[in-house]
Regions:
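Local cysteine-cluster metal-coordination motifs and their immediate loop/turn environment
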Residues: 13-26
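Short active-site neighborhood of thiol/selenol oxidoreductases, capturing the structured segment around
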Residues: 8-11
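Short amphipathic alpha-helical interaction segments
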Residues: 333-345
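Short, amphipathic alpha-helical interaction segments positioned at domain boundaries
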Residues: 364-382
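A short, conserved structural fragment
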Residues: 348-357
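Minor-groove-contacting beta-hairpin "wing" of winged helix-turn-helix DNA-binding domains
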Residues: 358-362
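C-terminal scaffold of the Radical SAM
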Residues: 3-5, 26-50, 56-333, 381
Length: 382
């Protein structure tokens, strides 16, 4: 399905310190490397701005890493470049990720003055011991100050990241996290369960398992999240995301709804014209790129079956699920003709439900969403 709209993701890989659970493309760097990277990033933005001049950019997300680790002048340069070279819609949602302790009022005001209208704070926990074990370098008090400054700077759309099932966490401490943050009334809360990724310090930590909550407690934490946040006026619209009415993350909804997106910067992925491609993950390779169009030109278009997989796998993350009518419009055949067996089996097991035109995961299905969603992957091209 062709669309003239796209989303833009800008990757800033730099961090003051890498967290023990993090497997993202992020690291500490010298000033010289940061300067060289920002120069190359600007070059890439200008290249794609010319190539995609006819596209309407509906959301921008500056992520990382820790974008707020950069000087405010650096973020200003990035914003000026995108506004000059892309067609940014008037009502575009423009988000920047920030860590508490890496912003001040002046920096936050610069963000607002340059068109950034949404900020996402990576808090993870309000508990000192939990923050320390995660390798976070901020305190809850620093977060409160950063949050207050963001409001003073004029941010009317704030997200706070929280994490459950972390080392040393209890049901009581997690409930305390939820209530403390909900009382601050940010417009959006992302509540993720910790995943131990290979290659991280957590993965190598032999003592970690005994410090993690039990699987039973992890399930209780997940159920508790929705119950408590509902009390404070938040609605769950995706497996791990909650928002006040009208404040759902438009950028993330775009990913889950198959909106094309351009990713610029180190290791950034893109989905344009039914092609998926990505930039190098090695800094030296990225800085030596001669033509930013090569990855796009060399990428093959996704097959119809791969597009179907993504429609199901991504769309079913949303609590409202997916539309059977939209499936027909996209692919020219019914969802039942392709996935009838999987749908019937999942519904029989109580993992999925159908209401009118829409199919979605049940509460039980969400708890084992990865297993349920994998049923909609083809074993091979058919």
């Amino acid at each position: 399905m062709k669309t003239n709209t796209i989303e833009l993701y800008i990757h800033i890989p730099f961090c003051k310190s890498k967290c023990r659970y993090c497997d993202f493309c992020s690291f500490r760097a010298e000033e010289e490397t940061i300067h060289a990277y920002l120069g190359k990033l600007k070059e890439e933005l200008i290249f794609w701005g010319k190539k995609l001049a006819a596209r309407d950019v509906v959301t921008v997300f500056i992520g990382g890493g820790t974008p707020s680790y950069l000087r405010r002048e650096d973020i200003q340069m990035i914003c000026e470049t995108i506004f000059e070279h892309f067609h940014i819609c008037e009502d575009a949602e423009i988000t920047i990720e920030a860590n508490p302790g890496t912003v001040d009022l002046k920096k936050l005001c610069t963000y607002r003055e340059n068109g950034i209208n949404r900020i996402s704070f990576g808090l993870q926990s309000t508990v000192k011991e939990e923050l320390e074990y995660l390798g976070r370098i901020h305190t809850y008090e620093e977060f409160l100050q950063s949050f207050d400054w963001a409001r003073q700077a004029g941010f009317l759309n704030i997200n706070v990241d929280l994490m459950s099932a972390v080392p040393k966490q209890t049901l009581t401490s997690y409930e305390e996290n939820l209530r403390k943050i909900a009382k601050l009334s940010p417009e959006h809360i992302s509540a993720y369960s910790l995943i131990i990724e290979e290659g991280t310090p957590f993965y190598e930590d032999n003592k970690l398992e005994e410090l993690l909550p039990s699987e039973e407690d992890e399930v209780l934490m997940y159920r508790m999240t929705e119950k408590i946040l509902n009390e404070y006026g938040y609605d769950k619209y995706e497996i791990s995301n909650y928002a006040k009415p009208g404040f759902e993350s438009r950028h993330n909804l775009g990913y889950w709804s198959h909106i094309p997106y351009l990713g610029v910067g180190l290791n950034a992925s893109s989905y344009l014209d039914e092609k998926r491609f990505e930039n190098p993950s090695d800094m030296k390779d990225y800085l030596e790129i001669q033509s930013f169009g090569d990855a796009y030109e060399g990428a093959r278009s996704l097959s119809v079956y791969e597009q179907m997989e993504e429609f199901m796998f991504l769309g079913l993350r949303k609590t409202k699920g997916i539309s059977k009518k939209e499936f027909i419009e996209r692919f020219g055949c019914s969802m039942d003709s392709v996935y009838g067996k999987q749908l019937i089996e999942s519904m029989k097991q109580g993992m999925m439900k159908e209401e009118g035109d829409r199919v979605f995961l049940t509460q039980d299905g969400i708890l084992v969403s990865n297993q349920v969603l994998c049923e909609f992957l083809f074993d091979k091209e058919v």
